[in-house]
């Protein structure tokens, strides 16, 4: 069985009853507006339309609730202890006992009462020892005191709401959404009201007296709600005043009287004896301790310490936490005593203790009243007139325009405002002559850090004061008639800020005509080290002589050409390498001499260049013509391509035998892995390390 679904059904039934009450009250309001109000054209009035709309919505919602309740009831199937559904067999029999028709259907729960009856009638819930339900009187006699106390705790005065009162009364709380419809465990019936339920017994479900007593005998709980479903254990114990506690105790006494009167007026059995069910209820009501409601005036700590066996023990504090709490308590006591001494002034300690003991009222143990101490007032600094210092502070803030105008008038009267300071303003609100108002600070150390330097005057340590220094700034410069000269920079930095927040600073230089003759030609030259300057001077001297340097250069170049020719004859080179060797020989050949006039024609060589180093130019004489020079430049213009081809050919020579490994473009078969993937390429460092062990792929 699913208890939560049953609880949901019961809760929806109670909401159904509340909504029906609200709809009735709205209907009465509509009738009053139409009949008793006597307003002409009241049917078209806005408030009547509003009430009609609410009435219609409530009716629709109530119908939906009723249909959902019936649907949920029909879905609840009775199951046995093994989880199998209990089947109902309906047969129609004639007078002779012949079966006319039969139908088998799973047994469903029609209401909460049927659920309780069916659940008790299942075979798994009978007493196995005697083979059936035992007698109630013998069961009650065998109950121990602990079991009776447990049953009273489980009941918690649910008897009035579950139907032990006369049938025309029920306990409900105020119709607030989200609040439980049942009174609290500790007898908080002050807000409860009695009314006649407008719903018939078929729509609203409630337990009868016999079902409740039967559940008490069997030791089961009368409340359908689970533990902690709607309210917590100590919910009613928190934040209660003495007046609420007394009203709760009186409400409990009234409920007890009504229950006992109902039990005394009940009917007798067939044997003439009073029913044992009423005796059980009377014993439970009389044995329930009423002092609990009265003793709730104590603090929550006292209630927690005087708990029953079922409540948890308080956690054991560590030594560190105990010491911390003790220091806090002692600190609070010291603060209280010191503040009292300050506030009481000239009184002695003995009088302080007397006034403190007299001001605190000890709680009466008989009435268990909570005495609320008045908050302690700490001493506050006061003025000579006895007014609080914090309240007597007057702020100089300007609260209105009138205060500002009054302040400006006072400053004009005292001469603080100068007539010259009121200058014209531009479109941005800035004063045009603001630079004239700038004055130098009188303190010479205004912009410097103050050091702790000390001087010893007459053996005494005295710090230097600013007033001891003479004022450096003259009064003529301080006057507004002779302002300081301002030096403007040669460039203007204009900062443009876009909407995205990026700032672009544009540096606008001054016109260059004024600065053309300021810098000499030496300032634009590159910085050359002293070693290169010395070397260039030596080379210039050798070129002028033209004896020793040319001879050495020709010898070296001849040696290089001979070595290159010998290597080309010994090794067979590709045609590409032959082209490369010819280019190198042409590059390394000694330049032919030519007159200096032709060089000046197409190179525009200035006279200043002679004093500076030009790399790889041993002399300023060029031996070739202009056309030959241009052709050579075109041939060797793409030196990067030549060097790249050189290193490609160099990579191929990885074996001493002179055999070449073809590139991927030249190779028809690409070596593959076992899985069919291309093998990774080896770097040139790996190939150089492996050398002869590199496999050569043949195809």
UniProtKB/Swiss-Prot annotation:
It is found in: Cytoplasm. One of its GO terms (cellular component) is cytosol. Coiled coil: none annotated. InterPro entries: DUF3835. Residues 183-194, 323-338, 574-603 have a biased composition (Basic and acidic residues). Pfam families: DUF3835. Residues 308-322 have a biased composition (Basic residues). Residues 195-208, 339-360, 548-573 have a biased composition (Polar residues). Residues 175-208, 289-364, 539-603 are annotated as: Disordered. GO terms for biological process: formation of translation preinitiation complex; RNA polymerase I assembly; RNA polymerase II core complex assembly; RNA polymerase III assembly. Keywords: Cytoplasm. This is Uncharacterized protein C736.07c.
């Amino acid at each position: 069985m699913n208890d939560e679904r049953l609880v949901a059904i019961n809760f929806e039934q109670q909401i159904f009853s509340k909504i029906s009450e609200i709809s009735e009250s709205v209907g009465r309001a509509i009738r009053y507006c139409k009949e008793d109000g006597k307003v002409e054209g009241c049917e078209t009035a806005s408030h009547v339309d509003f009430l009609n709309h609410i009435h219609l919505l409530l009716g629709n919602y109530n119908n939906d609730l009723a249909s959902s309740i019936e649907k949920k009831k029909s879905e609840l199937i009775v199951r046995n202890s093994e989880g199998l559904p209990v089947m109902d067999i309906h047969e129609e029999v004639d007078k002779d006992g012949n079966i006319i028709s039969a139908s088998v259907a799973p047994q469903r729960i029609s209401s909460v009462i049927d659920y309780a009856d069916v659940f008790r009638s299942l075979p798994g819930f009978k007493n196995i020892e005697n083979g059936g339900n035992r007698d109630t009187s013998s069961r009650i006699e065998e109950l121990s005191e602990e079991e009776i106390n447990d049953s009273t705790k489980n009941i918690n005065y649910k008897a009035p709401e579950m139907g032990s009162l006369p049938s025309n009364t029920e306990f409900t709380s105020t119709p607030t959404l989200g609040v439980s419809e049942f009174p609290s465990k500790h007898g908080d019936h002050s807000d409860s009201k009695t009314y006649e339920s407008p719903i018939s017994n078929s729509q609203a479900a409630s337990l009868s007296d016999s079902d409740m007593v039967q559940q008490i005998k069997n030791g089961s709980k009368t409340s359908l709600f689970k533990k902690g479903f709607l309210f917590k254990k100590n919910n009613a114990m928190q934040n209660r005043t003495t007046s609420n506690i007394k009203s709760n105790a009186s409400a409990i006494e009234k409920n007890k009287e009504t229950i006992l009167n109902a039990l005394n007026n009940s009917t007798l059995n067939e044997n003439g004896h009073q029913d044992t069910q009423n005796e059980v209820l009377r014993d439970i009501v009389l044995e329930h301790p009423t002092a609990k409601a009265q003793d709730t005036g104590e603090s929550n700590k006292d209630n927690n310490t005087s708990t029953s066996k079922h409540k948890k023990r308080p956690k054991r504090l560590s030594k560190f936490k105990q010491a911390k709490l003790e220091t806090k308590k002692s600190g609070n006591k010291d603060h209280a005593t010191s503040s009292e001494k300050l506030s009481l002034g000239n009184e002695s300690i003995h009088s302080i203790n007397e006034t403190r003991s007299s001001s605190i009222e000890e709680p009466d143990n008989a009435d268990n009243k909570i005495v609320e101490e008045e908050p302690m007032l700490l001493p506050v600094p006061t003025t000579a007139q006895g007014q609080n210092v914090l309240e007597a502070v007057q702020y100089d803030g300007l609260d209105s325009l009138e205060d500002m105008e009054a302040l400006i008038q006072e400053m004009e009267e005292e001469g603080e405002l100068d007539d010259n300071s009121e200058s014209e303003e531009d479109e941005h609100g800035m004063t045009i002559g603001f630079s004239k108002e700038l004055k130098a600070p009188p303190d010479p150390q205004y912009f410097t850090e103050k050091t702790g330097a000390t001087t010893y005057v007459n053996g005494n340590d005295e710090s230097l004061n600013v007033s001891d220094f003479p004022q450096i700034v003259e009064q003529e410069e301080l006057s507004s008639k002779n302002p300081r000269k301002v030096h403007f920079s040669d460039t203007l930095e204009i900062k443009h800020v876009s909407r995205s927040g990026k700032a672009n600073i544009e540096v606008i230089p001054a016109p260059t005509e004024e600065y053309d003759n300021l810098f000499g030609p030496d300032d634009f030259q590159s910085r050359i080290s002293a070693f290169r300057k010395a070397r260039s001077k030596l080379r210039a001297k050798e070129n002028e002589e033209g004896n020793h340097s040319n001879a050495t250069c020709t010898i070296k170049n001849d040696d290089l050409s001979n070595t290159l020719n010998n290597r080309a004859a010994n090794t067979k080179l590709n045609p590409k390498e032959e082209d490369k060797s010819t280019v190198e020989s042409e590059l390394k050949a000694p330049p032919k001499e030519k007159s200096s006039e032709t060089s000046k024609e197409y190179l525009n060589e200035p006279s200043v260049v002679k004093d500076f180093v030009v790399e790889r130019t041993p002399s300023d004489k060029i031996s070739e013509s202009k056309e030959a020079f241009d052709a050579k430049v075109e041939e060797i213009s793409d030196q990067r391509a030549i060097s790249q081809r050189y290193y490609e050919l160099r990579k191929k020579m990885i074996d001493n035998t002179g055999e070449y490994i073809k590139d991927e473009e030249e190779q028809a078969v690409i070596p593959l892995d076992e899985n069919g993937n291309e093998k990774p390429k080896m770097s040139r460092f790996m190939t150089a390390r492996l050398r002869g062990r590199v496999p050569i792929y043949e195809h």
